[in-house]
Amino acid sequence: MIPGMGMNPKQLKQMQRAMKQMGMDMKDLRGVEEVVIKLKRKEIIIKNPKVNVMEFMGQKTYQVTGKARERSLEAEMEIPEDDIELVMNQTGASREDATRALQETGGDLAEAIMRLS
């Protein structure tokens, strides 16, 4: 449940006071332009998000709301031509297979060669 949703201002103030008495503090984080969540193979990007910070028992919890979009990191990885040729020469693999192996291994030459051998 998002605090304050569907409440009138008086109810919201009462709820905030009750939270404060229980040791909970909730504030809006202002000026946030973008939130990026980095995963192994992609990023989740939220532009112009609304961010709330709730502190309870010394722990901070961030609540982020907004329109999210995903961006694949594998597709953006630029593999140097020399690396592709080295993998091709070492394994006899096609350009396509060598490139795919390098992308899947994050550009790790040894790992790409081992996968194709």
Curated annotation (Swiss-Prot):
One of its GO terms (biological process) is protein transport. Residues 9-77 form the NAC-A/B domain. Keywords: Protein transport, RNA-binding, Transport. The keyword RNA-binding applies. Homodimer. Interacts with the ribosome. Binds ribosomal RNA. Belongs to the NAC-alpha family. Contacts the emerging nascent chain on the ribosome. This is Nascent polypeptide-associated complex protein.
